[in-house]
């Protein structure tokens, strides 16, 4: 798996062959196919591993008690997400790009993203400040939109696309989006999270 990670750091997923992965790793073809049916299966394993780390990062907000200021927790979670995307950029870039051409990878990515949506919805359950702001509106489409917004902004940061080419810009815009949509307030009074 490490050889694939290293290749993804310098090559587009579509341009990497199983032969290139084998050459980089020094593994035998039979060894590769013992663990993975295809390079898509290898990417899926790398994505699951990265997303597991992402769910841990999201817990800075989703795992907080409702007594914690949610704007602080959102900013901390967004900062941890930005750090994760920076660390896992090659793998996460690859899945975003490959999902558009492979139905199994697309289904996997949608499922992985839905886990973030569901974690955020669970966090909002019983959150009085958000419930007051949302005033009876169904939070699912709002949270799903925010999840996919985050995916796109993190992806643009991973590809170093301005204006999202600095971690602070990513943290600021996503914190604003989440806190304004879910709490109706800007986090200006919050000390900025420092990029990790």
Where on the chain are the PLM-derived regions?
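Amphipathic alpha-helical linker/stalk segments
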Residues: 10, 46-75, 92-93, 124-126
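Short secondary-structure transition hinges
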Residues: 71-72, 76, 86-118, 133-136, ...
């Amino acid at each position: 798996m490490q050889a694939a990670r290293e290749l993804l750091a310098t090559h587009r997923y579509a341009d990497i062959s199983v032969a290139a992965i084998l050459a980089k790793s020094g593994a035998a073809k039979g060894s590769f196919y013992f663990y993975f049916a295809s390079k898509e299966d290898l990417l899926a394993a790398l994505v699951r591993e990265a997303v597991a780390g992402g769910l841990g990062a999201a817990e800075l907000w989703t795992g907080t008690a409702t007594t914690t200021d949610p704007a602080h927790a959102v900013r901390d979670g967004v900062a941890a997400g930005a750090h994760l995307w920076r660390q896992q950029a090659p793998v996460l870039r690859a899945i975003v790009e490959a999902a558009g051409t492979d139905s199994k990878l697309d289904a996997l990515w949608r499922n992985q993203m839905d886990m973030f949506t569901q974690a955020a919805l669970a966090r909002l359950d019983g959150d009085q400040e958000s419930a007051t702001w949302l005033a009876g509106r169904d939070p699912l489409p709002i949270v799903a939109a925010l999840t996919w917004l985050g995916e796109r902004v993190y992806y643009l940061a991973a590809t170093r696309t301005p204006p999202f080419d600095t971690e602070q810009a990513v943290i600021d815009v996503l914190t604003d989006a989440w806190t304004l949509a879910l709490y109706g307030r800007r986090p200006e009074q919050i000390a900025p999270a420092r990029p990790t």
